Regions:
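Conserved C-terminal RecA-like helicase domain
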Residues: 29-32, 36-42, 53-58, 65-68, ...
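Inter-Walker segment of RecA-like/P-loop motor cores
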Residues: 64-104
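Conserved pre-motif I regulatory segment
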Residues: 1-27
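Switch/connector loops and helix/strand junctions flanking conserved nucleotide-binding motifs
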Residues: 64-69, 96-99, 121-124, 156-161, ...
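Walker A/P-loop NTP-binding motif
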Residues: 11-18, 32-49
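A short beta-strand-to-loop transition that corresponds to the Sensor-1 phosphate-sensing loop
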Residues: 60, 90-94, 117, 150-154, ...
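Interdomain helical connector at the RecA1-RecA2 junction of SF1/SF2 helicase-like NTPases
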Residues: 159-260
């Protein structure tokens, strides 16, 4: 069953496509159900005989696999690009490895292309676009009959424009066709109101050959020394100490909120596995890795 916002957004997307406009940008808060929305739009386009095939692109293999399962379930068919399949779910990275025959074959069909987490791809023109943005601009954009861009966090730390996005002016606000905010999601009970407690190391020391330097926070350490952020987060003692602080804080919070959980943002999957091992073996916590 669709949520109200998904039903509303799908209807607006179909209306725009049927009005001979080919692109739709949906910004919805993380966890709201954007993949199910995209699959529903694809289902309606197929039912209306407006498309023949569906292609989905996303940042990681795990996300691409999740999209494949959702589309296969919603469309009641295989979604692996094989014989008899209605489409395929791929990563942005894989675009550059698809041969010319693949693209020539697609020109014979009406294709609906879904770009998940589109903010990972930057550039309004080939010049200045990042690698993924260039692939979209050069190979995908002109091929698609209809495109759907999805993002939970539609901004970039480098301030570059998001590929296929429209802005009010060169330095202006991103224009989207549909927005489902965290505030709306909380009101609809789609998401819970986040209550976040941050943990920082309030007493860091660096021991050199001649002196011992102390700092009141990680930020102060980074500003006043040549120490890199990477060297801190991969340091075994630092990791164990901060994870210990976090576990103690979580234990105190759970006295009032038994369902509270802890979140550790890792630098990579390998880093996450190392953190998970410390949490399980040294702090006796249950821990799962998500990407």
């Amino acid at each position: 069953m669709l949520r109200d916002w998904q039903r509303d957004c799908a209807m607006r997307a179909l209306t725009k496509y049927q009005g001979e406009q080919s692109h739709f940008f949906c910004q919805a808060t993380p966890g709201a159900g954007k993949t199910i929305l995209a699959a529903e739009i694809a289902k309606r386009l197929l039912a209306s005989n407006l498309i023949d095939l569906v292609l989905c692109f996303s940042p990681t293999l795990s996300v691409a696999d999740s999209i494949k399962r959702t589309f296969s379930k919603t469309l009641h068919c295989t979604f692996n690009g094989g014989l008899g399949s209605i489409g395929q779910s791929l990563t942005y990275q894989s675009i550059q490895f698809l041969n010319d025959e693949f693209w020539r074959l697609l020109t014979k069909y009406r294709v609906f292309v879904v770009f998940d987490e589109i903010h990972h791809c930057s550039g309004s023109e080939m010049e200045g676009a990042n690698a993924w943005g260039q692939q979209i601009l050069s190979k995908v954009q002109g091929l698609a009959t209809y495109t759907l861009a999805l993002s939970g966090t539609p901004w970039r730390s480098d301030s570059l424009p998001i590929v296929m996005a429209e802005y009010s002016d060169p330095d202006g606000q991103l224009l989207v066709d549909y927005q489902y905010s965290l505030k709306q999601a909380i009101e609809d009970r789609v998401c819970r109101s986040p209550k976040i407690v941050l943990v920082d190391n309030e007493h860091l020391t660096i021991t050199g050959s001649k002196e011992v330097q102390s700092f009141s926070s990680i930020l102060e350490l980074l500003k006043q020394t040549k120490t890199s952020y990477q060297s801190i987060i991969h340091n075994d003692e630092a990791m164990e100490y901060l994870l210990g602080l976090g576990c103690n804080k979580l234990a105190s919070i759970r006295l009032e909120s038994p369902n509270a959980g802890g979140l550790v943002v890792a630098a990579s999957v390998q880093h996450a596995k190392k953190i998970q091992k410390i949490l399980v073996t040294q702090f006796h916590q249950s821990a799962a890795i998500g990407t």
